[in-house]
């Protein structure tokens, strides 16, 4: 994003009620965007049967969405700075609604994946813009931290409740209904945005960086395609090796080219701030772990245990319910005490959840299974507010939108990698089911446990005095 969001006059002129309405509208947009990352997971088995899709086709159904979000969030944010945030916000809602309609009408997996791309294009116009509006509407530091905490909590809640809502919809109305439900929500949000969200533009919008944008898409696309298709082509395939080489060259290009631009797509100097750079890595770790958990769990519950979609969704209640309680408390705790404790709790819960999932087998009592899922709920409830706060709080207001966009990019990249990696690990075992599937999933659970440990360690490393000083130096530079 860029230099200014809401002008001081506009911001200070908003009443507390108007600010609350703006926050609510932004949260509604995040609910549909984030929920569509997870709500689709519980519908995957039904989609696969109805559309005769392969495991890689199902992976792309999830990853086409999160990959586009990861690749174009920053571009959409800077575009909103130039042409107006409310305008881009409303266009994004309309594109998301149209994509949802087309997903619901899909006659085949190719159509569905293409419609998911359109959905994601709309989503890229909602995520960074809504966060920038929230961050700049609430100017008082404590008030801002609470608002960002609510915003982050809503994101986590939507991610957790997606499979539960999706299970009920699939059971009652079929898998297409998980897309159609977005349409009335989007329509209400478009009207409310027109009525209550003030239009704003940046005083100096960041210029479009086509080379940086292309390099980012090349890196993300090459890595994800290589991971997903490695199951069929093999890791030693010239195609797979070539894709990783292309990704490495893309990273080198970013490191060489971006620092030379006045308005780079990726503001690499922000990464000198330890809290900020740690927040990006933790966002990637968190959603990589949770994306892998959801992808494996929904298929385990339905394809291995034979549960109906609604029952599978209800088994994930222990993931969603803690978010309702923990996220608001975490937001207040971050505002009052900082992000250290929530990050350590979140990382520890994810690590324990991954480690304990190693004992899940085809006949493990469901009570024991859902008890383990509770750990993932604790993790999700605690992780989002401190990550969002760490990414933004140390930055000047002029960089808040860009910092938030990069944090969101880390989340979406994490989801994409989590689905790609977990699908590659369990894909060959899915047709066999039973013990073959649960044994193959051990690789996923070890990965999830390691990611949780990484979040806890980074939480400690990024909140000390030295880390805080690096954030202050970056903000002043």
What do the PLM-derived regions correspond to, one by one?
Residues 73-85, 170, 325-339:
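Helix-to-loop junctions at the C-terminal end of transmembrane segments
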Residues 43-72, 111-113, 305, 310-315:
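Extracellular/periplasmic helix-loop-helix junction of adjacent transmembrane segments
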């Amino acid at each position: 994003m860029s230099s200014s969001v809401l002008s001081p006059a506009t911001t200070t002129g908003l009443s507390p009620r108007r600010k609350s309405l703006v926050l609510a509208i932004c949260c509604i947009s995040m609910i549909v965007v984030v929920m569509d990352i997870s709500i689709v997971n519980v519908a995957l088995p039904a989609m696969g049967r109805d559309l005769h899709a392969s495991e890689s086709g199902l992976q792309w159904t999830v990853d086409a969405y999160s990959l586009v979000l990861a690749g174009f969030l920053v571009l959409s944010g800077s575009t909103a700075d130039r042409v107006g945030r409310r305008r881009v916000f409303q266009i994004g809602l309309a594109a998301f609604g149209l994509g949802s309609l087309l997903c619901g009408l899909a006659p085949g997996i190719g159509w569905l994946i293409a419609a998911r791309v359109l959905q994601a294009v709309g989503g890229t116009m909602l995520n960074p813009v809504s966060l920038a509006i929230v961050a700049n509407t609430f100017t008082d530091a404590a008030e801002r931290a609470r608002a960002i905490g609510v915003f982050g909590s809503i994101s986590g809640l939507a991610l957790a409740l997606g499979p539960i809502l999706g299970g009920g919809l699939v059971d009652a109305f079929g898998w297409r209904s998980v897309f159609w439900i977005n349409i009335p929500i989007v329509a209400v949000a478009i009207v409310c945005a027109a009525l209550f969200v003030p239009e704003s533009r940046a005083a100096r919008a960041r210029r479009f960086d086509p080379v940086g944008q292309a390099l980012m898409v090349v890196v993300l696309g090459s890595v994800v395609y290589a991971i997903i298709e490695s199951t069929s082509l093999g890791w030693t395939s010239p195609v797979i090796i070539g894709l990783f080489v292309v990704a490495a060259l893309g990273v080198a290009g970013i490191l060489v080219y971006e620092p030379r631009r006045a308005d780079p797509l990726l503001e690499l100097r922000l990464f000198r701030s330890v809290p900020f750079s740690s927040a990006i890595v933790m966002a990637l770790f968190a959603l990589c772990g949770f994306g892998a958990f959801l992808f494996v769990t929904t298929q385990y519950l339905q394809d291995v245990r034979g549960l109906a979609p609604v029952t599978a969704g209800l088994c994930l209640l222990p993931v969603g319910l803690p978010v309702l309680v923990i996220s608001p408390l975490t937001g207040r705790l971050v505002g009052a005490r900082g992000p250290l404790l929530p990050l350590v709790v979140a990382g520890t819960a994810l690590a324990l959840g991954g480690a304990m999932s190693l004992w899940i087998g085809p006949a493990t009592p469901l009570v024991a299974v859902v008890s383990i899922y509770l750990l993932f709920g604790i993790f999700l409830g605690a992780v989002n507010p401190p990550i969002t706060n760490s990414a933004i709080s140390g930055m000047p207001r002029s960089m808040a939108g860009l910092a938030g966009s990069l944090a969101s990019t880390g989340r979406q990249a994490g989801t994409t990698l989590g689905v790609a990696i977990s699908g590659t690990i369990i894909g060959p075992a899915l047709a066999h089911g039973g013990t073959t599937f649960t044994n193959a999933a051990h690789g996923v659970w070890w990965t999830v446990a390691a990611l949780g440990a990484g979040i806890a360690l980074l939480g400690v490393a990024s909140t000390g005095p030295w880390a805080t000083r690096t954030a202050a130096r970056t903000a002043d530079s």
